């Protein structure tokens, strides 16, 4: 490995004797240095506080030719003699030996050994790829080390990723310590797999699972289709803009839940703990974050375990104002439920795509019959894990834990939160149509008029006050939910926030999203009149300034009613006949009118309200089995009313099922998909991705949606 640099005061750069490159303090962010040398004047300038705030624990030396008192935070004083240069080098070497986390450290050392391998993978460190022009290009594009680090588990030096031995075990123990879990398991095929591991380890046919209707489809797959458990659904909120909200407060009432049990499994209604598992989204896709303490205090005594699906959060414990939402920071006792937390590290933490982790916090119920031991969980883990893991994915999870250790993690997320606040302020200052989804006024003062440091430290500035017009969510209790400060959520015109009704003109968010992509900016998702941008410590002022500028530019196009060919050339050129001579406002109006004609915002809301849930007539596992046996037929969604769904159906994103296998098509769900069908035909170029329903072109050239139902 290449030696790291030494950072030094500019006046010392030329005086330091080292084989290492010496860089000035102002020319580094300290991620590439192994030691720091400062002057006495530097020690009084704030550099020591800056170094402490990094959380990197760098050795710091004070250079002085005179006797000085050793300041706090300084390792030693040096004056330039040879022995002291050796001490500096020794400290730098020791830092290099210790700053990497366990698995990644072992991996880099193993790669540097350059072993000759006759084991898989067959590309043999990339050599196979380099024997063909396409392969050579592939190799050069990704770089040498990714191929050298892709190796077989035939060599045991790196430990075992399936039974958790060696440095692999050390890495997961380290992550558990950082994230305050009892055990942590690294998962290399996403939180979809992580959720299935947990649900397969805990649930069997006949078990009751308390089920957030907002849950990602992977929870349906693991808990309902694979395990065959019986769900008790919790209704959830949608607001008129299309944002995904949280579970209604009344759903956390014990008597209410016992009545729901009487409807599906009356024999279990009076059991002390009727639910083997509750599955709750700790944070929704659209940034509604739960208070974990409230969840456990209200329903925890009814559940053996609670799985907090934290795919869209995971960083809450590193942000002080979000700490109450972290299940892993709670003090639990023998009467509380066991806790599982699944996190999509690749979403907003530092991980390659597909990296996920399972945190297990249940030592407080060890010895009880409901306790899930490691061996049982690992059995489920191995059901879903590959025997040929991609080691760079595992290493990324290891490095992610190291990044979040101690002050480093807190600093990085504090900077992210403050940058997000500054960006919201910039949008409020420059834009008239697009509004950040935050309380417009707090304690009689405009949100943006508070200092950023105040906004970043008090959850009041992100809280959903029950009944407040600005957010439009119903059924919330005080202090139940707040807006994730690391989700930059914007609303677009089309909804009157005071009434929740449609306005005469609107700008559907998908049109804005297309414009941004045309101009090199990729939002995370959009829906109806809402759009989401994920914020992570990777962001920069320049990047977010570009976004704000592009939002303002699009607003100008709206005001000018620019030609569609100019604003969305890709869509226009693909469908020139359909959109000939169209202007931007004309397209916005047509799409908005489509939403209004189907009342899509209310359909979307109704799908997740209990009174509008599709009727359940069959266990989801049984319906899925019938589908696999071919006991189904493909029918038009228009004709599916009263038929039993064989597949779950959803738009993606967000990946939340609207109808579950074993439920009956009809009502709001059917009308919602018919609205989507109308949009596919009326507005080509803006079709959503649909799963569980199929678009087929009929003889008249129109696209129709079909779905499988039981015969």
Locate predicted features.
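Non-catalytic terminal extensions of PLP-dependent enzymes
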Residues: 2-4, 12-19, 28-40, 45, ...
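Conserved hydrophobic helix-helix packing surfaces used for dimerization/oligomerization
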Residues: 3-6, 184, 209, 278
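Short strand->helix junction
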Residues: 23, 192, 285-286, 540
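Conserved PLP-enzyme active-site core in the AAT-like
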Residues: 39, 48-52, 56-57, 177, ...
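Short glycine-rich or small-residue beta-strand-to-loop segments that form or flank ligand, phosphate
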Residues: 185, 278-281, 531-536
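Short amphipathic alpha-helical segments embedded in low-complexity Lys/Glu-rich regions
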Residues: 190-193, 238-241, 530-532, 567-568
């Amino acid at each position: 490995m290449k030696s790291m640099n030494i950072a030094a005061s500019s006046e010392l750069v030329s005086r330091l004797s080292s084989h290492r490159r010496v860089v000035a303090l102002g020319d580094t962010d300290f991620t590439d240095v192994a030691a720091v040398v400062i002057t006495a004047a530097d020690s009084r300038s704030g550099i020591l506080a800056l170094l402490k705030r990094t959380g990197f624990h760098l050795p710091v030396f004070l250079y002085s030719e005179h006797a000085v008192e050793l300041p706090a935070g300084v390792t030693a004083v040096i004056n330039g003699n040879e022995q002291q240069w050796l001490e500096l080098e020794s400290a730098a070497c020791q830092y290099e030996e210790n700053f990497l986390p366990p698995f990644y450290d072992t991996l880099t050392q193993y790669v540097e050994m350059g072993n000759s391998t006759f084991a898989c993978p067959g590309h043999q460190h990339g050599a196979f790829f380099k024997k063909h022009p396409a392969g050579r290009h592939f190799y050069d594009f990704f770089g040498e080390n990714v191929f050298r680090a892709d190796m077989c588990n035939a060599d045991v030096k790196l430990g075992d990723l399936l039974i958790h031995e060696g440095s692999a075990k050390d890495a997961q123990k380290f992550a558990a310590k950082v994230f305050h879990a009892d055990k942590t398991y690294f998962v290399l095929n996403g939180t979809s797999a992580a959720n299935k591991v947990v649900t397969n380890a805990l649930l069997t046919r006949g078990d009751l699972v308390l089920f957030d209707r907002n849950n990602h489809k992977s929870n349906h797959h693991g808990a309902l289709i694979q395990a065959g458990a019986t769900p008790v659904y919790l209704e959830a909120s949608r607001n008129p803009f299309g944002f995904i909200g949280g579970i209604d407060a009344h759903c956390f009432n014990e008597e209410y839940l016992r009545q729901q049990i009487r409807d599906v499994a009356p024999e279990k209604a009076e059991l002390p703990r009727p639910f083997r598992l509750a599955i709750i989204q700790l944070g929704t896709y659209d940034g509604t974050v739960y208070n974990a303490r409230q969840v456990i205090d209200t329903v925890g005594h009814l559940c053996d375990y609670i799985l907090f699906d934290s795919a869209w959060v995971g960083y809450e414990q590193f942000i002080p104002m979000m700490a109450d939402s972290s299940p892993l920071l709670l003090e639990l006792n023998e009467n509380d439920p066991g806790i599982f937390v699944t996190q999509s590290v690749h979403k907003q933490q530092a991980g390659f795509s597909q990296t996920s982790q399972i945190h297990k916090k249940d030592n407080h119920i060890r010895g009880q019959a409901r306790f899930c031991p490691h061996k049982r969980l690992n059995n489920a883990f191995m059901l879903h894990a590959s025997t040929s893991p991609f080691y760079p994915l595992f290493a990324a999870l290891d490095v992610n834990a190291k990044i979040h250790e101690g002050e480093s993690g807190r600093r990085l997320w504090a900077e992210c939160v403050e940058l997000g606040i500054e960006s919201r302020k910039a949008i409020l200052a420059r834009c008239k149509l697009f509004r950040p989804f935050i309380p417009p006024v707090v304690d009689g003062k405009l949100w943006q008029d508070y200092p950023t440091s105040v906004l970043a430290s008090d959850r009041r500035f992100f809280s959903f006050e029950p009944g407040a017009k600005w957010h439009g969510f119903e059924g919330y209790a005080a202090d139940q939910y707040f807006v994730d400060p690391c989700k930059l959520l914007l609303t677009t015109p089309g909804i009157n926030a005071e009434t929740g009704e449609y306005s005469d003109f609107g700008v559907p968010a998908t049109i804005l999203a297309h414009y941004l992509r045309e101009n090199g900016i990729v939002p995370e998702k959009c829906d109806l009149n809402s759009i989401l941008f994920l914020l992570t410590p990777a962001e920069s002022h320049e990047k977010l300034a570009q976004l704000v500028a592009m939002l303002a530019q699009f607003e100008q196009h709206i005001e000018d009613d620019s030609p569609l060919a100019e604003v969305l050339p890709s869509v226009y050129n693909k469908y020139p006949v359909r959109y000939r001579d169209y202007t931007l406002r004309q397209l916005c109006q047509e799409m908005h009118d489509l939403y209004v004609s189907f009342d899509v915002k209310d359909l979307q809301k109704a799908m997740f309200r209990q009174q509008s849930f599709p009727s359940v007539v069959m266990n989801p596992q049984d319906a899925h089995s019938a589908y696999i046996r071919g006991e189904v037929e493909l029918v038009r969604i228009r004709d599916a009313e009263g038929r039993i769904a064989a597949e779950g159906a959803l738009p993606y994103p967000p990946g939340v099922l609207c109808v579950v296998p074993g439920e009956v098509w009809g009502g709001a769900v059917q009308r919602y998909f018919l609205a989507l069908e109308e949009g596919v035909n009326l507005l080509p170029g803006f079709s959503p991705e649909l799963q569980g329903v199929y678009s087929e072109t009929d003889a008249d050239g129109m696209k129709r949606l079909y779905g499988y139902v039981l015969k």
